[in-house]
């Protein structure tokens, strides 16, 4: 594996577009005069490329990873419908294959130049080799975590190689990370290549921390498949320096325009509406009040005592969302304080969070819901202005046409904050909160790691609050025992399970105030559904919120390996098509099963055509058919 690189079974394309001197190079990698180029150019081209230009970012980050992780509301891959066009583009010489080729070329070219004695003139080449190995390890995880076994190509020879199993890939990348981190030499002057390192500007100590944090992440990933190796690798990585502060973020600076550095969330037509998963996790979590100006505070409503309008004739009930059928006609008074910084209030342009990409706030108007017995006749009027709620996607069947004036407009949903859409941020690949939440999980598992589960959990929350400029609010938040919609509280020591209780709601059809028993969901794929407030659920609730909006593939991977946090089913007003959707039916719509969530995406269709033998070998290593429900080696089974 260490002499191979990932490749699609496609023709080799021209090489890169990078920056600085490397912009002048536009040749096949086999034909590049190696005396003209430096290994760091290949490394930086790979890092910058993986930032994703708008074409591939929309297809993979927004429409695939964000759907899989429930960062955004939507159907598509959320319900198991992958897109062959998206996947084919991603696993091509324009994108993922190129990035891996570039990373491997950086390793190989660096090794050749060192062997040829050039390290006497350019000693920093020795470190560039290790940096490229670390980055390649990440890329291998990014690609294989989506597909499973991936094809390999002997280094730039153009000859298709055999597929590697996920187990072999993970064994390789864990070894690579350990060796590369140990080989990095902080005493070497890296200033000659600092402009060619989009991550850390040549800071070797930061690369060492990134390597250790990444090894912690990937070791924990395989805890179900090889617990002994996972524990051994994790403990070793955790005993060294890891990303523990915001100054150590592994991140890439965005730039406006259309390039690899354009924000992955920049496309104006992508609504990026708040999902029910996110809403259920943050509403009621903590005792912090939603920050609204005095002029809008009349719209605050207590989510602990009030559910909203029960629109059972217009909203689907065929879901295990505990808020099924309800429309929250206001702003929840108590939410996780990070949530209002991430998603806008409907109809309120605060100048900071609200993005007019979804339409001007002034466009939000009262809408009609139509009569189920006569879908041309308005039955109810709903005013979405100054609300903060959402509802499941999926198959609404006839109910979809009755509520389309509400559900069919992007500006009727809380949507992703403007600041993340303007290409002015740094795209985060690894934050300090993740290191701490991984350590907290390891501690709960009884592993030998620094800090206690509680201290690491609280450090993770604190790091996330600091990222959002909310440090002053974290103290009260960490002591809160209030439950969110799932039945999880913040306080690490508060593990009492939430019980059903009576809440108020409004019947909009009769205009009556009524009560009902609110029942928390049963997450059957985690510990049999008996726990919503144990230590692990708290850790993964906080980890999920902290990873928004930058790390959707990681959240998807977490859910695939442990079943946390709770992911509700989307609406199933009619049975799903098992040929291109997860196998949900009306009868099973309220159940929680592993097969109701996509585990991977299918291989590009042209691989079957171009290399049937290799494709069949991949399926043999995968251990199942080429469908989204087939679990990867490390998945929860």
Feature-to-residue mapping (PLM):
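Bacterial Sec-dependent N-terminal signal peptides
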Residues: 1-27
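Membrane-proximal, proline-rich intrinsically disordered regions
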Residues: 19-69, 355, 576-637
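An aromatic- and glycine-enriched ligand-binding surface/loop that stacks and positions planar moieties
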Residues: 20-73, 217-389
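Conserved, well-structured interaction surfaces
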Residues: 70-190, 422-427, 633-634
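Short coil/turn linking the two alpha-helices of tandem helical-hairpin repeats
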Residues: 142-151, 221-227, 447-449
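Flexible, polar/acidic helix-loop-strand segments at domain edges
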Residues: 311-444, 455, 459-462, 475, ...
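Acidic/aromatic/glycine-rich contiguous surface patches that form carbohydrate-binding/processing clefts
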Residues: 447-528
């Amino acid at each position: 594996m260490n002499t191979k690189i990932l490749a699609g079974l496609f023709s080799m394309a021209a090489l890169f577009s990078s920056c600085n001197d490397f912009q002048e190079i536009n040749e096949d990698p086999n034909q590049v005069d190696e005396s003209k180029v430096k290994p760091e150019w290949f490394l930086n081209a790979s890092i910058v490329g993986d930032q994703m230009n708008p074409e591939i970012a929309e297809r993979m980050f927004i429409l695939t990873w964000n759907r899989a992780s429930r960062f955004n509301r939507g159907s598509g891959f959320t319900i198991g419908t992958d897109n062959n066009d998206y996947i084919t583009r991603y696993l091509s010489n324009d994108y993922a294959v190129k990035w891996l080729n570039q990373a491997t070329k950086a390793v190989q070219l660096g090794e050749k130049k060192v062997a040829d004695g050039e390290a006497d003139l350019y000693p920093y080449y020795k470190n560039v080799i290790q940096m490229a190995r670390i980055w390649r390890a990440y890329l291998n995880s990014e690609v294989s975590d989506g597909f499973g076994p991936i094809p390999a190509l002997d280094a730039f020879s153009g000859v298709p190689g055999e597929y590697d199993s996920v187990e072999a890939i993970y064994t390789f990348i864990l070894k690579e990370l350990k060796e590369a981190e140990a080989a990095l030499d902080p005493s070497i002057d890296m200033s000659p290549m600092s402009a060619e390192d989009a991550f850390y500007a040549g800071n070797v100590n930061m690369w060492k921390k990134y390597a250790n944090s990444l090894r912690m992440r990937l070791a924990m990933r395989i805890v179900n498949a090889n617990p002994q190796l996972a524990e051994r690798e994790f403990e070793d990585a955790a005993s060294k320096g890891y990303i523990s502060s915001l100054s150590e973020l592994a991140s890439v600076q965005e730039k406006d325009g259309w390039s690899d550095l354009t924000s992955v969330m920049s496309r104006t037509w992508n609504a990026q509406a708040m999902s029910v998963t996110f809403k259920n996790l943050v509403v009621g979590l903590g005792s912090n009040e939603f920050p609204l100006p005095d002029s809008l505070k009349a719209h605050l409503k207590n989510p602990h005592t009030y559910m909203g309008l029960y629109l059972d004739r217009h909203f689907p009930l065929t879901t295990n969302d505990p808020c099924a059928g309800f429309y929250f006609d206001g702003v929840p008074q108590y939410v996780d304080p990070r949530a209002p910084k991430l998603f806008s209030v409907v109809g309120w342009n605060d100048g900071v969070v609200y993005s007019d990409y979804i339409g001007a706030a002034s466009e939000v108007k009262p809408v009609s819901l139509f009569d189920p017995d006569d879908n041309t006749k308005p039955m109810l009027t709903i005013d979405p202005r100054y609300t903060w709620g959402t509802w499941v996607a999926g198959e609404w069947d006839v109910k979809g046409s009755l509520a389309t004036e509400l559900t069919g407009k992007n500006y009727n949903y809380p949507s992703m904050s403007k600041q993340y859409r303007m290409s002015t941020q740094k795209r985060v690949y690894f934050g300090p909160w993740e290191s701490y939440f991984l350590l907290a999980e390891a501690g709960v598992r009884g592993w030998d790691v620094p800090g206690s589960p509680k201290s690491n959990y609280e450090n993770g929350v604190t790091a996330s609050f600091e990222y959002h400029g909310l440090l002053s609010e974290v103290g009260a938040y960490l002591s809160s025992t209030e439950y969110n919609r799932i039945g999880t509280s913040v306080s690490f020591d508060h593990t009492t399970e939430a019980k059903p209780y009576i809440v108020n709601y409004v019947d909009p059809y009769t205009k009556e105030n009524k009560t009902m028993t609110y029942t928390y969901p049963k997450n059957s794929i985690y510990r049999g559904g008996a726990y919503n407030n144990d230590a692990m659920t708290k850790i993964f609730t906080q980890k999920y919120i902290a990873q928004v909006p930058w790390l959707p593939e990681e959240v998807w991977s977490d859910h695939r390996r442990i079943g946390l946090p709770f992911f509700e089913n989307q609406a199933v007003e009619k049975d799903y098509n098992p040929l291109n959707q997860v196998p949900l039916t009306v009868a099973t719509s309220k159940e929680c099963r592993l097969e109701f969530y996509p585990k991977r995406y299918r291989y590009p269709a042209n691989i079957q055509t171009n290399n049937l033998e290799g494709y069949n070998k991949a399926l043999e290593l995968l251990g199942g058919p080429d469908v989204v429900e087939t679990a990867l080696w490390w998945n929860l089974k």
